[in-house]
C-alpha cells in the first residue's frame, strides 16, 4: 500500500471513481497480452481527460523515485501520462524530461526508436504504464531504454491486473508501483 499525502489520498479516491465510471467494463474480452478476461480496463478515457490526467500525474509524481530525471513509456497508452507528469512536475518547480518509445523504430530520417530530448547516458528513467497485465509492454520499453544506456529502476502503473506483471518485472530487477489493483474495482462492486 502506498502512503500518499492527505491531498493525494483524496485524489486517489477521486481517480478510482473516474476510472470506474469511464474505464472499467465487465464482459468477455481479449487483452493486449492475448489473455481472456471478464474485466476490461481502458484508462485512456481518463488519461485523456483534463481532470483525470491531473489526478494521475499528481499521484505518479508523488510515487516516483526521486532519483528519476525522466519518465518514458510505450506509445500510445503512455503518451498522455508522460506529458502530464512532466507538466505537473514543472508546475511544482521540478525539471523532468519525457521520452516516448515507438513500438517500431522509424525506417526513415534518424531511424529513432525514442522520441524526446537527448539525455545523458545513465540517466535514471521511470517507465509509466496505464495497465499492467503480464508487463509485456513495460518490458519492451525497459529493453529499449537499456539499449540506449538509461537506468530503469521502476514502472509506475495506474492499474496492476495481478496477472504476473509484478513477477515478470521483478525478474528484470524492476519494481512495479501501482495506484490500483484489479481488486480495487472488484471490491467496489462495479456493475458495468
From Swiss-Prot:
Residues annotated for 5-phospho-alpha-D-ribose 1-diphosphate binding in this entry: 102-103, 106, 129-137
Any GO BP: 'de novo' UMP biosynthetic process
MF (Gene Ontology): magnesium ion binding; orotate phosphoribosyltransferase activity
Organism superkingdom: Bacteria
Key words, A-Z: Glycosyltransferase, Magnesium, Pyrimidine biosynthesis, Transferase
The protein's Enzyme Commission number: 2.4.2.10
Matches recorded under InterPro entries: OPRT (IPR023031), Or_phspho_trans_dom (IPR004467), PRibTrfase_dom (IPR000836), PRTase-like (IPR029057)
Cofactor(s) for this UniProt protein: Mg(2+)
Pathway annotation: Pyrimidine metabolism; UMP biosynthesis via de novo pathway; UMP from orotate: step 1/2
Positions contributing to orotate binding: 133, 161
Reaction catalyzed: orotidine 5'-phosphate + diphosphate = orotate + 5-phospho-alpha-D-ribose 1-diphosphate
NCBIfam families named in the record: pyrE
Functional summary from the UniProt entry: Catalyzes the transfer of a ribosyl phosphate group from 5-phosphoribose 1-diphosphate to orotate, leading to the formation of orotidine monophosphate (OMP).
Summary of subunit composition and partner proteins: Homodimer.
Family under the similarity heading: Belongs to the purine/pyrimidine phosphoribosyltransferase family. PyrE subfamily.
Protein name listed in UniProt: Orotate phosphoribosyltransferase
Native source species: Prochlorococcus marinus (strain MIT 9515)
